[in-house]
């Protein structure tokens, strides 16, 4: 497996998975009707950097990194991760998160914050906690889950060393 900066052709290959994930409305607060061009801009162009993890020619997952906020708070990074369904349970999200922390340090960030981890996404919450992220806040009924209705979201944070 190797992690590299994303190309447009990588995103084109991952697009069906990306679209399925946002249309499921279980983990990401993206418009489920987002088109390719808007999704590419949102995930790959607007962030500071974007990466994919590949095995052979298969894309297993992706993440972006960007400042969580501008100006005096720009030392805190924010990331988003997606893993293809057929790659789940293989440690891909963990590898991506560890890679993103290293990249964050290289880019001069001192912390990482996830602004809206859907509380019902137990696998992600548990993984982030194993990787020393703390829940620093709960946003009540912040996410309109397709099957469960309004559920809480967590703000999760980690100081980087």
Give residue ranges: language-model regions.
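Acetyl-CoA-dependent GNAT
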Residues: 31-86, 97-98, 103, 159-160
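Conserved beta-strand-loop-alpha-helix junction that forms the acyl-donor binding cleft
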Residues: 114-124, 143
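Conserved GNAT-fold acetyl-CoA-binding loop/helix
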Residues: 15-41
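Terminal substrate-recognition subdomain of acyl/acetyltransferases
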Residues: 81-82, 139, 145-161
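Conserved acetyl-CoA-binding loop of GNAT-fold acetyltransferases
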Residues: 129-139
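Conserved GNAT acetyl-CoA-binding A-motif
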Residues: 104-117
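Glycine-rich acetyl-CoA-binding "A-motif" of GNAT/NAT acetyltransferases
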Residues: 58-61, 123, 150
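A short beta-loop-alpha structural element at the N-terminal edge
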Residues: 1-14
């Amino acid at each position: 497996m190797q992690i590299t900066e994303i190309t447009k052709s990588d995103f084109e290959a991952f697009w069906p998975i990306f679209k399925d994930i946002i249309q499921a409305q279980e983990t990401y607060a993206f418009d489920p009707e987002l088109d390719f061009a808007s999704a590419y801009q949102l995930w790959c162009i607007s962030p500071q950097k974007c990466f994919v993890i590949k095995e052979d020619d298969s894309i297993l997952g992706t993440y972006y990194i960007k400042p969580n906020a501008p100006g005096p708070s720009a030392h805190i990074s924010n990331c988003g991760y997606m893993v293809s369904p057929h790659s789940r349970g293989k440690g891909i999200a963990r590898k991506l998160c560890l890679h993103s922390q290293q990249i964050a340090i290289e880019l001069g960030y001192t912390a990482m914050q996830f602004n809206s981890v859907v509380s019902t996404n137990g696998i992600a919450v548990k993984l982030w906690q194993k990787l020393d992220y703390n829940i620093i806040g709960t946003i009540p009924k912040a996410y309109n889950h397709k099957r469960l209705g309004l559920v809480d979201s967590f703000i999760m944070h980690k100081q980087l060393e």
